[in-house]
Structure formats: C-alpha cells, structure tokens
Curated annotation (Swiss-Prot):
<dbReference type="InterPro" id="IPR001272">
    <property type="entry name" value="PEP_carboxykinase_ATP"/>
</dbReference>
<keyword id="KW-0479">Metal-binding</keyword>
<dbReference type="GO" id="GO:0005829">
    <property type="term" value="C:cytosol"/>
</dbReference>
<keyword id="KW-0067">ATP-binding</keyword>
<keyword id="KW-0456">Lyase</keyword>
<feature type="binding site">
    <location>
        <position position="231"/>
    </location>
    <ligand>
        <name>ATP</name>
    </ligand>
</feature>
<feature type="binding site">
    <location>
        <position position="332"/>
    </location>
    <ligand>
        <name>substrate</name>
    </ligand>
</feature>
<keyword id="KW-0464">Manganese</keyword>
<feature type="binding site">
    <location>
        <begin position="247"/>
        <end position="255"/>
    </location>
    <ligand>
        <name>ATP</name>
    </ligand>
</feature>
<dbReference type="InterPro" id="IPR013035">
    <property type="entry name" value="PEP_carboxykinase_C"/>
</dbReference>
<keyword id="KW-0963">Cytoplasm</keyword>
<keyword id="KW-0210">Decarboxylase</keyword>
<feature type="binding site">
    <location>
        <position position="231"/>
    </location>
    <ligand>
        <name>Mn(2+)</name>
    </ligand>
</feature>
<comment type="subunit">
    <text>Monomer.</text>
</comment>
<keyword id="KW-0547">Nucleotide-binding</keyword>
<dbReference type="Pfam" id="PF01293">
    <property type="entry name" value="PEPCK_ATP"/>
</dbReference>
<feature type="binding site">
    <location>
        <position position="296"/>
    </location>
    <ligand>
        <name>ATP</name>
    </ligand>
</feature>
Length: 541
C-alpha cells in the first residue's frame, strides 16, 4: 500500500493506534462489494437499484445541520473567522475551545480503533496552483464512495508523493454524549480545526456534510489569497463563453448549468482566479425529487453504475419513485462529473465568466422573472442573498421560507460576507462580466415558474438575445425588465401581472422591501455596506 507510513502517522495524530484493515483508494468494484455486504446492518448497508446506482438511507439526517458546525477558536482564527457571536452580524461558525476539540478527537479515535478503515486521497480544486490535497478517512464504505464521487482523483504519479494538506474524518456512529458538557447544540458535530488542518464529522450520516465541510475550508483559504470562492455552478458555451449560476440549494444551480447545449464545469462550488474559473469538486450532487428523463435528461441519465442515490423511495422491484417525497424533499444523487456527456476539457476548468446569474427563489412573487443588474446593484443583491430556503435542504425546513443568505451561501462562509463580495465584484469589474437576477421561485398566484420558461430565459441571456431599456423597470426595487423573450409569454416578464391589482403588488413588494432594508442593516457598520445603502429598495417611489 502506497503512503502507508504517512497514513499511520495521520491515524496516530488523532489517537487511532489499531485497525483491522486499511483499504486505500479503493476502486468502485471494491466499494460496491463492501457497501452491499449482506452482513452490514442499518444505515451502513446499500441497495442496488434497477438503474444500477446504489441507494443509501441517511436516517433522520436528510439535510445539513448548520447549528452543529464548529471552528476551533485559537490564536490563528480568533480575529479572522466570522463568528456566531459577532455582535453586528451572527454566522453559523460556532466557536469551540481546544479542550472540546481534544474530546471530539478522542471520540473519533475510539470509534475507529480496531475497525476496517477506508482511506481516500483526492484533490479539492481543479486548479493545480490553488487545490487542496485532502485525505478522507471513514469506517463506512458508502461514505468513502461518496467522497470518491465528489472530489478529484489524483493520477498515479501524484499519489506516489501525496502528502495531504487537510484531513477529513467522517464517522457517523461517533455520537457525542457529552454535548451538553461541551455546550454544543446537539450530539452531532461538524468541527473544523484550521491550525491542525483537520475536519471531524460525527453523528450525522448525511453525505452533504462532507462536501460542504470542505467548501467551508476552501472559503477560508482562497479569499486570503485574493481568489474568489463561490457557491455557484458553472458552464461553458461552444464559443468558450462562461456562465456562473449563484443560488442556495434547490434554486436551480445544478439543473440550469447541466445543459446539453453547453459544457459543464461544475454544479456547486467554484473558485475564480487570474487563470479563470475552476471547480472544487470532481462530481455532482443533484436533487432528485420529481426528476424525470423528459425534463432533466442529463441528470437522469447520470444515474447509473457508481452513482449514489440518497434518501429516494426504492420500490420492491428496485425501481425508483422520484416523485415520492415521503422520506424527504431533499433526495439526492451523487455521481462523478464524467457521468455527464458534455463537460469541459480539461475537466472542471475554464476561462473568465461573461455572464453571472443570481438565482433567487422569491416566495412573495413580487420579483420579476428576470432582470439585469448594474455593477453596484450586483454588489447589493450579492451581499443580501435574498432567496427562500427550500424544503428539506436543512433539517426542519418543510415549506419555502423567505430568507437572506449573504453571498448566496451564508451557511458556508468562514470569513465575513464583505470579504467575498469585495473579491468577487473586483473580478466582475475587471473582466466586465454582466450580472442578471433570475427568479426561479413563484409568481403572485403562488405558482412556481416552470423549468421550460426558466431555460428559455437562461438561453436568451447566454445567447445575447435579451434586451433591457431604462424605461422598462419594476419600481421599488428599480429592476430593469425585458419586454420580450423568445419562448416566454410576455405576461410572465412583469410580476405585477399576477396580482389582482397593482396596489396588491405594491403591498407585497413593500413587505419584502422592509425585509431587505432590515436585513442590510447588519452591513451598516462596514465601509462597503455604507456605500451600497443607496441601492436598497425605495418604498416611497
């Protein structure tokens, strides 16, 4: 086994002294044999489906647990992490001390000692100058499979000299019974130590915690190098034109960027440096609720051997009912990016974006279907991050909830939101990227905008077939709207058409405007926030 000595050092650093076996960088056939072993019980065991993908059940953990995310507060991090106890603007980055960290390491070690361990070395980041070498360790075969799907596999020469920058331990059975003594939120934890370069995940089986944990790490490392770290998907046209799609989970990042007419760069997490845009991952993590081959053929056809279906309804004949949300509305599939036919070459890297699209799921129905933003409006809406939390993406979310998520990914930001906004908008200005706001939510009749019409809007943006004039705008928000888009009824372009009267639209728009104004007060103490106040909604128009 390559790197055995280094692996043993890694294990010893957390207190793992004995193991029954180490399976290093297993291939998919080995993982399949391990994860479908009939001796496995409960959430460890996987089911082979008719689509040849395996299906896993993550128990009660069908979404992320943001209240269970922690950073060790020490000399390195105390003055730079955006902490949950920040008086001006609280985050999800809850502090723990070194004593609690040591206890969590012991818990991980106790759960992994004398176990069969799966160890996978991979890259987080397709750009060679800015990637992170990651070692992943778990005792659960399908979690190793998930990591293998989601990150970038080194070639043999790279493995021979692989020394990790960061280590991830994912141990779902490591339940912290001392959580009250540690003053934590629950018995589960996603704990990051940036001094020891280690991420510990315990108590939760949800695969998304693995990828989002490393996303949080990249969100710390890259901005300190003046590189934009972004919660977005990305694709490239036949003319090498790059588009970014920002948005919270469930707003359409994966669906809209996976397009047969364009090449996929990545579906969720990207960096933007002087070389261009690069994906952090080597796989995709798509929502599957109501998935059909007719509406989303690329994603549907990616569900095959080596894919992992998470929390889907498996029928007795091993077929999948993608329309059954009994378990969760947040059912998912993880697959290697090469399951998508149209991907960029070299994989997961491209040039600088021509178009940037903010996806917002407006639950009020007052936002236009599409609008064009000025540079400063782009800063304001990026910092505001208005959208709706959609069903199942976090534990406890059932109906769409209007929310503000700074940078369209507040839960994953390690530093203050203004850090990301300044860096991103610097790149946008330098490379003259255009910014659009697309509403993938609801109209005033509480009807969800259709995927068909949304794709027509995206196509119009990317093909330069959308025109805006200053005189055609939505008041209060001062958002420019087009008069006509091929494939979209004119009625849909002005949100006021879906209200019983203009007064009713104004009433709802005023309610939302007040939420914008209230939310942006958390930036009023910052230099950037003071600069952007004048771009907030105007209630008395």
């Amino acid at each position: 086994m390559k790197n055995k000595e280094n692996i043993l050092i890694t294990l010893n650093q957390v207190g793992i002294e004995q193991y029954s076996n180490i399976i290093y960088n297993p291939n998919y056939d080995t993982l399949f044999k391990e994860e479908t072993n009939k001796n496995l019980k409960g959430l460890e065991r996987c089911i082979l489906t008719k689509l040849q993908a395996i299906a896993v059940d993550t128990g009660k953990f069908t979404g992320r647990s943001p209240k269970d995310k922690y950073y060790v507060r020490d000399e390195k991090t105390k003055n730079i992490i955006w902490w949950s106890d920040d008086n001006n603007h609280k985050s999800n980055n809850h502090p723990i001390n070194n004593e609690t960290w040591k206890d969590l390491k012991k818990l991980i070690a106790n759960n992994l000692n004398n176990k069969k361990l799966f160890v996978i070395d991979a890259f987080c980041g397709a750009n060679k100058k800015n990637r992170l070498k990651v070692r992943f360790i778990t005792d659960i075969a399908w979690q190793a499979h998930f990591f293998k799907n989601m990150f970038i596999e080194p070639i043999e020469q790279e493995l021979n000299k692989f020394l990790q920058d960061f280590t991830v331990f994912s141990v779902p059975k490591a339940i912290n019974k001392k959580w009250k003594d540690h003053k934590l939120n629950s018995e589960n934890f996603i704990a990051i130590n940036l001094t020891e370069n280690t991420l510990l995940i315990g108590g939760t089986w949800y695969g998304g915690e693995i990828k989002k944990g490393l996303f949080s790490v990249m969100n710390y490392i890259l901005p300190l190098k003046n590189i934009a770290s972004m919660h977005c998907s990305a694709n490239e046209g036949f003319k090498k034109d790059v588009a970014l799609f920002f948005g919270l989970s469930g707003t359409g990042k994966t669906t809209l960027s996976t397009d047969s007419k364009r090449y996929l760069i990545g579906d969720d997490e990207h960096g933007w440096c002087k070389d261009g845009v690069f994906n952090f991952e080597g796989g995709c993590y798509a929502k599957t609720i109501n998935l059909s081959e007719e509406k989303e053929p690329e994603i549907f056809n990616a569900i095959k051997k080596n894919a992992i279906l998470e929390n889907v309804m498996v029928l007795k004949d091993s077929n999948i009912n993608f329309f059954d949300g009994t378990k969760t509305e947040n059912s998912r599939v993880s697959y290697p990016i090469n399951h998508i036919k149209n991907i960029v070459k070299p994989i997961s890297q491209s040039g600088h974006p021509k178009n940037i699209i903010f996806l917002t799921a407006d639950a009020f129905g007052v936002f236009p279907f599409v609008s064009k933003l000025s540079y400063f409006q782009g800063q304001y809406y990026f910092l505001s991050g208005f959208t709706s939390k959609l069903s199942g993406t976090e534990r406890g979310i059932i109906d769409p909830e209007p929310t503000f998520s700074s940078c369209f990914g507040e839960a994953f930001l390690s530093l203050h939101p203004t850090v990301y906004a300044k860096i991103l908008l610097r790149y946008i200005k330098y490379y003259n990227s255009k910014i659009f706001l697309v509403n993938t939510g609801w109209n005033g009749k509480r009807e969800r905008y259709s995927l068909e019409y949304t794709r027509s809007i995206i196509n119009a943006i990317l093909d330069d077939k959308i025109e805006f004039i200053d005189e055609n705008y939505i008041p209060i928000f001062n958002l420019k709207i087009p008069k006509k888009i091929e494939g979209v009824p004119d009625l849909f372009l002005d949100p006021r058409n879906f209200f019983s009267s203009n007064e009713e639209w104004i009433k709802q728009a005023t309610i939302l405007s007040k939420k914008f104004i209230k939310n942006f007060k958390k930036f009023s103490h910052t230099k950037l926030g003071k600069k952007l106040i004048k771009f907030e909604p105007k209630i008395n128009f």
